[in-house]
Amino acid sequence: LVQPTSEYTSRGKGHQALTLLGYHSITDVEIDKNPSILQQFDKVVMLHNEYVTRAMFDAITNHPNVIYLYPNALYAEIEVNYVDQTITLIRGHNYPEQEITNGFDWPFDNTHPYEYDDICLGMEFYKTKDGWMTNCYPENLFLVDTEQLFNLLKLIKDL
């Protein structure tokens, strides 16, 4: 029997599972245009939001209870032009200087080494200043390991 897998679908299955469980979704655009929107929620579950504006970064990192479900969130600073419908990389991913990795110099960046662990055999949440982070990329749990998926979703609910 071959188990279904996917290669980095950028949190699509996680979003679908949380939506089916009744979690409210907010788009990046909504947060960027109205950063205070997050204040109405006791908990914010971040997916793989790698490219964010400064307004989004500040709104998310100032919320007291964020669950960073995927590593590599908040990695690069962008600017959005809603009139021209363009996104411009401002900082991060070795830009504008080679030594710049995280565009916000964020001390809680957990991209390396966790972004590429998609097996999640020893998946854990660990505490940060504003919430919790995972130590692996859990996307394939939504297809393969129902027991571990159940435990993950229960933990998200309880945090």
At which residue positions do the language-model features occur?
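Aromatic-Pro/Gly-enriched surface loop or interdomain linker
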Residues: 1-37, 83, 99-159
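Short alpha-beta junction capping motif
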Residues: 37-82
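C-terminal substrate-binding/active-site "lid" region of AdoMet-derived donor-dependent transferases
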Residues: 76-99
